[in-house]
Amino acid sequence: MYQQHIFYFITGGIFILWILAHSFFVKIIYLWASGCLLWYCLETRTFENKNNLGTSEPFLVNPAIFQKRARQLALSKLLLRQPLYPGIPEISEEIESIISHFMQKYIKVWSYQIIPEPTISNSIESHLRKCLMVLLSRVDEIDLADVLVKTVLPLITKHLRLFVEAEQLVVGNKAVSFTDHSELSREVAAKYDHGRLHEAVLLSGNPMVAQKRYLRNWTTQVLSIILPNYYETSPLVLSLVTEVIINTTLLPLVSYISDPDFFNYLIIQASGSIIQRRRKIRRLKRAIRKQSNHFQVGARRLRLKDSQHSFEQYIHEIKKISNISDARRLRSELMVQRRQLEQTEAFDFEFKQYRERLQIAIITAEKRISLLSGTPFQHKEAVLFEQVQSLLQILSDSAAVSCFLEFMERKNRSRYLHFWLVVEGLKESQDDPLNAHMIAPFSDIVSDHTDFTAIVKSYFESVDNPLDIPKPLTNTINKFVNQSKDNLNPDLWVEARNAMLMAQEHVFDIMQNSDYSEFVNSEIYYRFLAQDVVSDHKSTNSSATFSRLEELGENIPAISKQPSYLSISSSSKSINSSPSPSIQLSVSSSISRDKNLSPLDLELDDPTYSDEEEVLFAPPGDLQLSESIDELNNNIEELKAQLNAINTLIKKAELVADQKQLKSLTKNHQEIEKAIHRKERQRDQYMSQEEDSKLFNRSRVSIDSFKISKEENTPDFAVYTIRIERLENGHVRSGWMVARRYREFAELHKQLKQTYPGVRSLKFPQKSIITSLNKNVLEYRRGALEEYLQSLFRMPEVCDSKMLRMFLSQQNITAPQMFNPKEVGKKWKQLLEVLGFEVNNSFNASNVNTNSSFSGPISEFLVELFSPNDDAKQQWLPKKTYISILEQLFGGALEKRIRLQLFQLFTPEKIYRKLREFRRGLEGKSNHDHSKDRRHSRARKPAYADRNQLKAEAGILLASMFPGYTPDIAVKRIFRILQNQSLNAHVIYTLLDEILLALKKHARSTNKAT
């Protein structure tokens, strides 16, 4: 090394001297020699370094590390596939086939181009399988009915309401012309919820970027929750899994479902058979009409889309009416149609033509009425529509007061009208209505004291809805009321009667200012005008007016179901010098109406009813005695309230010595007493048997046998016969048998697990697909179910549960099939007809329990779907009342029906069948050429071009789902909503947010439990 340095020094010196002293050519020669020398030196040094590498240490010093890396590399080439759904092997195999096809088509195609080994595909498949196993395990814990009804359906209801509001903002009160349907959809989406769409939905720019960004974030959060060892997984693998899920599953699925053509195709598929049936029915009706010469005229309504020929035929039918009552009914219906049309905004020429046709039809009906009645024709339609009565005239007519009372009930302000009518019943003469300045006998003072006391308790001291009466007036009345009956001051009596009259005038002013103007513009008032019930000879005499009010006053308690008011108004009217015989009819009417509200009171109308009627003895298999006792208690309370009202009427009838009225009231009193006595005896009988109906330590259960049954259009199934025996001192005293299917056992087990944690540890036979009813399998299941029931009988809290008692009760009859579309339409139409014209007789919204957690969302959805777009003040009934009606109509049968349908829809057999069809579809689709798919899509697209035909088919389909009560509103709303792709995507992404929130909530609860 030292010699080399000397050599370099000498060479460098010579080179410098050469540069300074020699010529150009010599310099070139020396420069070449120096380069050769420099190359030789560098080459020699590199060779020495290579020789030194042989003495360095190896980079894998530890053999254990080398072996670990080698094992990991070998394991990455292998994948251990565990069953995804071990409970049902058939379903697990189908899922395996789908995953295999998915990996082969979407993953291995590009992964083998990167690395010709299964390392990447195995890693992705492993993580996907872990996610599926976690999701499938959690699906079994989900109550699908609760999720759909309590979570998804409220979102759909809100979406429906916001869509209607946005559409009203875009369309407004006039016709708006859009050159393209997509333009209207964008405008509606922009106004939807004041422009607050989901973050993944963009109306401008590139929406795909926002969707991918949201789905990437959503998938990452979901994987962090459901994927085991998420934070220990390679970021590269997580990124690959996320992109695979987004681009191959989520994004195509969202785009496919949000496309309006997806729903259009479903409508076309579902309505095909319905259209064929409707065509056959239409031809049959046409043939029957040709054969019948006496069909009912006016059975069909005049419609907006009717042709000129149909309209002329309709007019011809009106001219053939031979019954004056039919003609008047038809005229009233036409007037209602016209009134409804006037309350809507006419957008085009069709509405104007429809209005003119209604006008012609009304005039034709009036001419027919004139001809049939033999009176000269005078067109009074303008008077009928424009006639507006004063509030005093309305209160002086019984029919008008009935309509006004219905209107006040809807506004929850009927107490004002009740109070006015009560005080009106106290008046005795026209000149001095309350007879305030006459010193009446002492009995009159006592009677007024009783009436005033009841009025104060019912209207002045009421906590729920007190009347807004000035304090000086109430103080004056209270002074008289607070006196002792033995020492009543006549001066205070006179002051109290004057104060009561002033309070009545004050209430009249309140109704005049707050309610009258709305009432005369409401549909109720119009219906009153159109029913030909306006008296042409209204007397201005107050006594005649008050007598008509008396007839109406008796009907009020049956509507409000307030016993206090019944006693007040009835007692007040008995003071009059000429009692009306309508009291007898009204009392009977009120009793019968209460019977309609309480089905257990029907025996009051039975003339053969006697107190000696046998009391029902509950059979041993009746385990629902507690519910029956509660129902009887409610009916007894209602009957006692009626009895108190009758007692008050009897006392007043005795004062006026009306023997006819007294006889009728006494008879009604006896009938109600008999009904109360019978129900009390029935209740006592059930109470004496209630203790004996307990299951714990008093009964034993066994499953003796099973039998194979078959229903129409369903495969064979097994029914297990359960024997329950009553024990007394170790001996069997009585027993009964019930038959249940396995799915009923499974539903019972599912409900009990949610309520009683101890049931979760019991052994229950799992679901499995039984291709054929093997007796060995059924016998094994029979023994397992018997052991399960016997375990339940050893748990006292489960034995007392309502679910188990209903399951084992012989009285647990399957709910009636209310969801046949024709039956539902018929029942609903009848209900609405009663509410529309006799609402006073049938329903009291204040007595409805609106806390139903299951039927409430469904009722709200139906109300939102079928409610008109008018202002809330002009609606036929408030939405709260609609919801209460639907909850009463459906009750628990709706929940049971939905759970049963979902259970039947997601049975293992059907899930297996759907998975198999899906797998075969994937395999068959992969075998086709893509060009054929494109040609097929191009050939199918024109089926959606004819929007009018599609809308008609949608109307037919939805009309079959909701028949009998003008489904046109629902048809149009649903169809318009489904055609907006942006809002469809908004709903889907909102549901994804709800899924993410539910997963986070479940993860937090799991972490707290652990």
From Swiss-Prot:
Region Disordered, annotated ranges: 923-944
Transmembrane residue ranges: 6-26
Stored InterPro entries: Phox_assoc (IPR003114), PX_dom (IPR001683), PX_dom_sf (IPR036871), RGS (IPR016137), RGS_sf (IPR036305), RGS_subdomain_2 (IPR044926)
Superkingdom field: Eukaryota
GO terms for biological process, alphabetical: protein transport; vacuole-ER tethering
Coiled coil: 622-692
Span of domain PX: 698-815
Predominant place of localization: membrane
Cystine connections: none
Pfam families on file: PX (PF00787), PXA (PF02194), RGS (PF00615)
Basic and acidic residues: bias regions: 923-932
GO CC terms in record: endoplasmic reticulum-vacuole membrane contact site; intracellular membrane-bounded organelle; membrane; nucleus-vacuole junction; vacuole
RGS domain location: 390-529
Annotated localization: Membrane
Membrane topology: Single-pass membrane protein
Membership in a protein family: Belongs to the sorting nexin family.
PANTHER family tied to this protein: SORTING NEXIN (PTHR22775), SORTING NEXIN-13 (PTHR22775:SF3)
Protein name: Sorting nexin-12
Species name: Schizosaccharomyces pombe (strain 972 / ATCC 24843)
